Amino acid sequence: MNVAIIGATGYSGAELFRLLHGHPHVSRCDVFSSSQDGVHVSESFPHVGSVDGAVLHKLEIEALSRYDAVFFATPPGVSGEWAPALVDRGVKVIDLSGDFRLKDGAVYEQWYGREAAPAEYLQKAVYGLTEWNREAVREAVLLSNPGCYPTATLLGLAPLVKEGLIQEDSIIVDAKSGVSGAGRKAGLGTHFSEVNENVKIYKVNVHQHIPEIEQTLQTWNEAMEPITFSTHLIPMTRGIMATIYAKAKQPISPNDLVDLYKTSYEGSPFIRVRKVGQFPATKEVYGSNYCDIGLAYDERTGRVTVVSVIDNLMKGAAGQAVQNFNLMMGWDEAEGLQSLPIYP
């Protein structure tokens, strides 16, 4: 199997390269760039200097059309321009950007501030929240990989929403991410002196992942209302913790909550539901494709609390992309992803 990565000089692209380089079914993994040609990836990431042939190539449709699958780990706007031509040529595309996540182009343009991809391809794209969309992923030609925050949030909410157990207008999500979630481009906001020993909120009420989360919730339950969603930058490299609050329609015991989630995620190799009274930490999924979930119910307030943690570069990006790629190719979804978290 021959694959290509566009955008291998960013954090998600580098993680993709690491995973695909060691994938049991991938014999060749080439890298492409819109800004560099003939430069070895090690110029950006010295840790891959021992990999022969990891030289960046210029973006060309004809060259990319020769691959079985092409991954886009690019900023918004790139895949929207290039992916349709590849799809038309029968190449399977896995897009890690947000260009194909939203079905309504006007909504994309409102939240991303740029022109949307052609409507035909927005409708054709399959949303790759793997655990809840396996059958569609298996048939996908254009796969839209979920964002990091939506992955943690939606995996945490799905059983409650699908079973109709929470009030539709009551969801509050308090999400925190490591600095790698802001990307590799240098900026004041991610400067060491600004991030170290500091926690800060950002994109209050305007984060582009809000409509993505709401769109999916409404496909599960048309009565779902807008959510309250806040994001914070934490002084760590990797990891997302989404702490989710929602008002239960009826009292539910912690044991029943845990049983619901374990049943919902039975057969999902990367979802680990904690015992009653136990809650996950980001360190416990570091470097892995796992999503760990802890649950509680407060009898005083009638609220359910869900704690969902992932590695933002793995389950929140490259790991989930490979999980979807596996299904698209007819393999076991866990191929190349079985590594346990790195600890400590």
From Swiss-Prot:
GO BP, one annotated term: L-arginine biosynthetic process
Catalysed reactions, semicolon-separated: N-acetyl-L-glutamate 5-semialdehyde + phosphate + NADP(+) = N-acetyl-L-glutamyl 5-phosphate + NADPH + H(+)
Predominant localisation class: cytoplasm
Xref: CDD domains: AGPR_1_C, AGPR_1_N
Pathway the protein acts in: Amino-acid biosynthesis; L-arginine biosynthesis; N(2)-acetyl-L-ornithine from L-glutamate: step 3/4
Function: Catalyzes the NADPH-dependent reduction of N-acetyl-5-glutamyl phosphate to yield N-acetyl-L-glutamate 5-semialdehyde.
Matches recorded under HAMAP family: ArgC_type1
UniProt-recorded name of the protein: N-acetyl-gamma-glutamyl-phosphate reductase
Natural source organism: Geobacillus kaustophilus (strain HTA426)
